[in-house]
């Protein structure tokens, strides 16, 4: 209701975690973006990657699909191992970019806010998967668990992964407790939070500056009497 009653809303960003990815519509194979809208999304996504330092900008439907994909489909923007932004034929129009890809193999997110904001209200909507833990050291398009472990040891002082240790559980008996800690793996640790916030705020301001700037070109007045105009 709030959005419906505020047609002045022109842009939105929602923040999720994690992955270091800028997401945009479409989220389903049936949805196609007009070329003019896609150009705008691609242009802002590229600028967003530059300020956030994230590695990928993609539609929701394309993200990491099919399984094991290197995220090199049409309409995706990817940061290379040298830090440059590479675009993959951005004006395809959205939807199913993989040709023979079957619908059941794809990530179709029906009922998502991104598509709703865009299609129902004409709002330029992004969703950012903030914070990427680890680096794609072998440039295969994904950050593996071994790469994350290496990153934790070399960059995070081994603070994010807890070694598996035996524990006598009152109900389950002998178990092991350990693995990735939620804070640090899915969300940045406090020393890294400020930088993460600042980069995302810069992308928000960048998007806001790209919206139309309204001006009043002419004002007419009509006297209605009793000092009322």
What would you call each of these model-derived segments?
Residues 1-228:
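Metallocarboxypeptidase
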């Amino acid at each position: 209701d709030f959005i419906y009653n505020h047609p002045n809303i022109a842009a939105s960003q929602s923040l999720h975690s994690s992955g270091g990815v800028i997401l945009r519509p479409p989220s389903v194979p049936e949805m196609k973006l007009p070329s003019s809208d896609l150009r705008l999304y691609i242009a802002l996504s590229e600028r967003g990657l530059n300020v956030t330092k994230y590695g990928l900008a993609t539609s929701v439907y394309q993200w990491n699909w099919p399984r094991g994909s290197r995220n090199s489909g049409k309409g995706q923007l990817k940061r290379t191992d040298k830090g440059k932004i590479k675009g993959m034929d951005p004006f395809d129009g959205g939807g199913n970019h993989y040709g023979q890809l079957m619908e059941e193999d794809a990530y179709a997110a029906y009922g998502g806010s991104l598509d709703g904001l865009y299609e129902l209200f004409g709002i330029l909507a992004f969703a950012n998967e903030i914070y990427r833990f680890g680096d794609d050291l072998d440039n295969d398009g994904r950050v593996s668990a071994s790469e994350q472990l290496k990153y934790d040891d070399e960059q995070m002082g081994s603070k994010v992964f807890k070694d598996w240790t035996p524990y006598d559980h009152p109900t389950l008996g002998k178990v092991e407790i350990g693995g990735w800690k939620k804070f640090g793996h899915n969300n940045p640790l406090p020393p890294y939070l400020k930088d993460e916030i600042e980069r995302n705020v810069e992308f928000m301001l960048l998007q806001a500056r790209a919206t139309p700037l309204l001006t009043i070109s002419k004002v007419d007045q009509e006297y209605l009497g009793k000092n009322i105009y």
